[in-house]
Amino acid sequence: RWELCPDCQKAIKENGLKNEDDLQMFFMTKVNVYLKSKGYSSVMWNYDKIDNAESLSPDIAWTVCGMGDDKGLVKNELMRGRKLINTHCYPYYFDFPYGWNTLKMVCEDDGALTDKDEETWGIEAQMWTEYVPNMKRLEFLTFPRLGAMAENAWAEKGYPSFSTFLHKAKDYYNLL
């Protein structure tokens, strides 16, 4: 879209930017400055088209879907101090069928993107609804995986086990 937008193309020229990727980083930097002035943190999606994020403040956290880091960008950004939120498609894309992202996978994933816990700010589930035809299907795909993810997010490493979660899930189902 930005390639076709006259205002975006004008902003690229006026600010001496190379392309639409630079425009996104320019825009996110402005948003980050504003949010920081109000006492908030910024989070943006790490996406495949970025080759270099050096112009982007390292205090903007990234959600990382784990589609691969062939260019070493995520590793470089970690070295710069960027915080990451794990939103790996396996197991945190809840629009994927249970055969791809099983309840056990969600429950037993440690949430870490690296060996150092402090580098991962948290975990996040995705529910892309373009292939979810109705609320019944949405609920089926989301629950109890969301409960397993929540238990996993605030639990000690290695807890809950899958069997422990299944035992606790009885109470969880009563709340639904």
Provide a role label for each language-model segment.
Residues 1-62, 67-80:
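Active-site neighborhood of glycoside hydrolase catalytic domains
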Residues 49-58, 62-174:
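Conserved alpha/beta catalytic core and glycan-binding cleft of carbohydrate-active enzymes
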